[in-house]
Amino acid sequence: MFAAAGVAAQAEEFVMATGQQGGSWYPVGGAIKAIVEREHPDITITVTPGAGVSNVVGVDAGRFAIAFANSISTVDSLTGKEPFRKPTTNVCNLGILYPQYFQIVALADSNIKTVADMKGKGLTTQQLGNTGEFLTRELLSTAGLTYDDLSSVAHTSYSDSASQMKDGHADFFTLGSSLPTGSVMDLASSRKITLVDVDPETFKHFKDQNAAFQLREVKAGAYPGFDETVHAISYDTHMVAPCDYNGDTIKAVLSAIADNPDSFAAISKTMANLTVEEMATDIGIPFHPAAKEFYAERGVAGME
């Protein structure tokens, strides 16, 4: 559980749930921890690995004070849509950090160019409770496929997935992360890879379920040896907290992000030019009262 004491009044310790090692959430969380603890010695943050869906559930249940999440999952949580078992009632938005891309990485010699081509192939993906794993099942369904139609399915970390691909134990690897992703960079350094293009009809399947989905380009050169531009399903990484959580701590975390772009650019290039206006984008999830105050104090219009 987390403490809800004011940062100026007494020491505070809390848990911040991030993502799997080998992805971008975990190191970004580590950078936030370092900056906040440096600037506020009375705050101690424990950064723990997590997953998009389970992080939101954990915040709602009071297990995490702050957590990383995906916009699409958090929107679904408000109504209890699958994979959530019931609606969340105490989850508020803190701000957007950067876009996430649902990447479908295939070995070049696997001949996987469409979802239908995945039949009979080996998959490595995230564990249950991860947004990327849920999206993988949805992706397969667009071609009438399930996990039972694949030769093998592994639920593991990004780094272990990359190792399985290197060793030829899997043909394709699905994940939701920023661009570029370290584990995919590692894979591309030793195996020729392709990214499967998402066509408009496949994207419509996702967009019809959640308006927060976007179709964004992954440019040629995003990874070593990757020489064509493709389209990927995209959404946003943001941070959430219980709606009644300590406002001083919320502002300390948001200040750490907004005032130290260089610290985050080295981890995720897309955070290099992050502005408070972008952080304050309305994604259909209520803002924490302290987050609204923070953005209003920083001059963001419409936050009064």
Region locations from a protein language model:
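Sec/Tat signal peptide C-region and signal peptidase I cleavage site
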Residues: 2-11
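Ligand-binding clefts/hinges and TM-proximal coupling segments of bilobed small-molecule sensing domains
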Residues: 122-138, 212-283
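Extracytoplasmic
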Residues: 11, 40-42, 51-54, 61-64, ...
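Extracytoplasmic small-molecule ligand-binding "clamshell" domains
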Residues: 27-28, 35-60, 226-227
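Bilobed "Venus flytrap"/periplasmic-binding protein-like clamshell domains
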Residues: 13-39, 43, 100-167, 262, ...
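Pocket-lining segment of extracytoplasmic ligand-binding domains
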Residues: 71-73, 80-82, 108-110, 146-245
